């Protein structure tokens, strides 16, 4: 459960992300594909090369979804319901992949926002991404 302090930290960090959410999403996807090659199996139709339009496009979707989640931090299930349906019923993404992408997102944010990525912000973002992952996998059960 996200505390009021966690919510404040997440919103402040995401304000720093600003218009870079799509770029950071794409970078996190590239990190995930390089660090966890089995995740590539969900994207057989993508050119997974650095900077490819498909990875950039999906990175923008990831960034937009997270921006939406931050905006609706008090109602993540409502905000992410359609995305949860898509990943559970149509795409059938293995739930572990959300944890892998979350880790890569944290690394990406730490790399781009080093002075803002304090231990408290790190913990809050980790809890937030875990909450998002939980919502996205909630319909698998």
Curated annotation (Swiss-Prot):
Modified residues (N6-succinyllysine): 7, 11, 16, 40
Protein residues bound to O2: 58
InterPro entries: Globin (IPR000971), Globin-like_sf (IPR009050), Globin/Proto (IPR012292), Hemoglobin_a-typ (IPR002338), Hemoglobin_oxygen_transport (IPR050056), Hemoglobin_pi (IPR002339)
Phosphothreonine, modified sites: 8, 108, 134, 137
Annotated binding of heme b, by residue: 87
Keyword field contains Iron: yes
Positions bearing Phosphoserine: 3, 35, 102, 124, 131, 138
Keyword Oxidoreductase attributed: no
Tissue specificity annotation: Red blood cells.
UniProt keyword terms in alphabetical order: Acetylation, Heme, Iron, Metal-binding, Oxygen transport, Phosphoprotein, Transport
In-chain residues carrying the UniProt-annotated modification Phosphotyrosine: 24
Sequence ranges assigned to domain Globin in this UniProt record: 1-141
GO cellular component terms listed in the entry, alphabetical order: blood microparticle; haptoglobin-hemoglobin complex; hemoglobin complex
Gene3D superfamilies linked to this entry: Globins
Modified positions (N6-acetyllysine) in chain numbering: 16
Family matches, as Pfam families: Globin
GO biological process terms, semicolon-separated: hydrogen peroxide catabolic process
Top-level taxon in the UniProt lineage: Eukaryota
Single Gene Ontology MF annotation: organic acid binding
Family: Belongs to the globin family.
Quaternary structure annotation from Swiss-Prot or TrEMBL: Heterotetramer of two alpha chains and two beta chains.
Purpose: Involved in oxygen transport from the lung to the various peripheral tissues.
Protein name: Hemoglobin subunit alpha
